C-alpha cells in the first residue's frame, strides 16, 4: 500500500484543480519521490527474501506513483472503480505501507486524516483506527501480518501501538497539519531500504492484527450530514454527525461502508508476494 502525505518532502495537500506550471511541477516531483521511496522499500524486501512485490497505489484515485522510475520487478494496482479498497491483498504473505500519514485528529500529524478531511474519526470495537489500522485489519482477516511502515513520525507511533514489533521508519516528523521536519529524500530512501530489509527478517515473529467479531464500526463526521429518517444503507444513525454499522467481518464492513460487492477475490493464490 502507498500513500502520498507521508512521503519525505510533502507537507501540503495535493491540489488537483490548480493548473499552474508550478503546481504541475510540484505534483510531478512528489510522484517521483513516492516512486523512489517505493523502490527503496522494494529493494529492502527483496534483500530480505521476498520473491515478488505487489504495490497498491493508494493515494487518491490510484494515479500517483511515477511508473517511469519504478523498479521493473514490481507490479502495481492503480486506477479507480476498484473491486475493493485493497484488491489482491489476500494473495500476499505480508503487508506494509510507504508514505503513511497519521489518522484524523492527531495533534501534530502532518496532513493527518482518515480517508477524507471531512471525517473526525473511525472506531472499530471502540478501537480508534486510521487508514493503516484498516489495512492491518483487512490483512489480519487473511492471517497476514503488517510488518513495515514508513512516513510521518506520528503515523509510525500509531501503527506501533496496534502492531507491536512492526518495523517503522519516520522520514519526517509532523509539527502541525501543514508543517514537518523532514529528512532529505535521498536519506529517507536509505532509511526505508534498511527498514524494509529488517522488517522481512522480523516478519515471522509478528502476529496479524485482529479484532473480535462481530465488528462494531462507528464513523464520526466533522459536519452534521446524517438524517435519522434517511440512514445510509446498512447503517444506524446515532446523531447528525455519527453512524454505526455492525458486520460479521471486515469484508462485510467495507461492503456496507463503501458499497463493494462480494466475489472480487481471485480464485487462486499466486506466487508469494510482499
Predicted region positions:
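Generic secondary-structure signature for well-ordered alpha-helical cores
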Residues: 6, 39, 43-51, 94-101, ...
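Active-site rim beta-loop-alpha module in soluble metabolic enzymes
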Residues: 138-146, 150-200
Amino acid at each position: 500500500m502507498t500513500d502520498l502525505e507521508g512521503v519525505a518532502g510533502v507537507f501540503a495537500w495535493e491540489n488537483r484543480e490548480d493548473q499552474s506550471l508550478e503546481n504541475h511541477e510540484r505534483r510531478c516531483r512528489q510522484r517521483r519521490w513516492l516512486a523512489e521511496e517505493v523502490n527503496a522499500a522494494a529493494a529492502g524486501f527483496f534483500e530480505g527474501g521476498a520473491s515478488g512485490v505487489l504495490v497498491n497505489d493508494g493515494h487518491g484515485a490510484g494515479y500517483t506513483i511515477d511508473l517511469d522510475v519504478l523498479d521493473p520487478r514490481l507490479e502495481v494496482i492503480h486506477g479507480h472503480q476498484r473491486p475493493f479498497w485493497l484488491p489482491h491483498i489476500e494473495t500476499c504473505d505480508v503487508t506494509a505501507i510507504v508514505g503513511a500519514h497519521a489518522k484524523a485528529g492527531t495533534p501534530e500529524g502532518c496532513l493527518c486524516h482518515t480517508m477524507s478531511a471531512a471525517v473526525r474519526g473511525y472506531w472499530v470495537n471502540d478501537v480508534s483506527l486510521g487508514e493503516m489500522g484498516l489495512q492491518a485489519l483487512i490483512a489480519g482477516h487473511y492471517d497476514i501480518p503488517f510488518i513495515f511502515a514508513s512516513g510521518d513520525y506520528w503515523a509510525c507511533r500509531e501503527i506501533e501501538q496496534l502492531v507491536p514489533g512492526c518495523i517503522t521508519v519516520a522520514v519526517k516528523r509532523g509539527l502541525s497539519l501543514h508543517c514537518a521536519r523532514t529528512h532529505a529524500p535521498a536519506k529517507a530512501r536509505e532509511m526505508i531500504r534498511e527498514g524494509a530489509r529488517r522488517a522481512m527478517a522480523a516478519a515471522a515473529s509478528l502476529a496479524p492484527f485482529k479484532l473480535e467479531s462481530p465488528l462494531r464500526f462507528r464513523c464520526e463526521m466533522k459536519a452534521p450530514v446524517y438524517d435519522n429518517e434517511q440512514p445510509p444503507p446498512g447503517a444506524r444513525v446515532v446523531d447528525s454527525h455519527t453512524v454505526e454499522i455492525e458486520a460479521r467481518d471486515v469484508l462485510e464492513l467495507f461492503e456496507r461502508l463503501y458499497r463493494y460487492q462480494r466475489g472480487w477475490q481471485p480464485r487462486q493464490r499466486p506466487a508469494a508476494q510482499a
